[in-house]
């Protein structure tokens, strides 16, 4: 077996290492960090902060994702969604993946310290540790509230972007964090319902496994209602204008439609469709924040 893994590990390509970083997840995080940067100032964001700040955040996020691959490699090898990942198939060794993660993390922090500020770097480090160590290494296997508690680390990018520009933590970026924090449970619990049997098989205590599907659907509805309320707050505190409010209402109504469909079992494959729409919801909501911000500047 060791020989087989060694031979397969030698076949690792740059695509395998790119996959370790979970590029699609990192891309969504970068969009929210970019929005945080642009919302932080009425002037332009310095190009060095824009380029190297986001690169630093991306490298740290990719490093945390690589650690996640290492810790979850046995789980990944069993689940249909993840069984072809590089570590699950033995194309990359755990040692190589951890070395890769370390290089990414150190490089990202060095860029943040050099081109942004110390607070942005330390908050990014805290987020990295929160996801890679606290969530992946402990919470994921310890409690059905893993997503709720660990979601704070994943919600940090808009705060990181804001702080990279201003060097300060204020109410506005914390509100952006709150939006992602409220979005995280319905996003992941919808996937957990869709993959319930697989999570049960690998003994990961996701909410549908420990408390049942109906209980999870109720909580998805509750968190979606909270998300909708929180998503209106940027308009309420004059952080955004009517264009954003309209987008928040329309996107929120569609998100609520899918969570109600999931609760009622009124649409086929409602769980995975809710999960997929939630990704577009967050992307579109933050783009609306950005567009609205520059429209406000024009008027």
Curated annotation (Swiss-Prot):
GO terms for cellular component: plasma membrane. Keywords: Cell inner membrane, Cell membrane, Heme biosynthesis, Membrane, Transferase, Transmembrane, Transmembrane helix. It is a multi-pass membrane protein. It is an enzyme of class 2 (transferase). GO terms for biological process: heme O biosynthetic process. The keyword Cell inner membrane applies. It is found in: Cell inner membrane. GO terms for molecular function: protoheme IX farnesyltransferase activity. Signal peptide: none annotated. Belongs to the UbiA prenyltransferase family. Protoheme IX farnesyltransferase subfamily. Carbon 2 of the heme B porphyrin ring is defined according to the Fischer nomenclature. Converts heme B (protoheme IX) to heme O by substitution of the vinyl group on carbon 2 of heme B porphyrin ring with a hydroxyethyl farnesyl side group. This is Protoheme IX farnesyltransferase. It comes from Stutzerimonas stutzeri (strain A1501). The gene is cyoE.
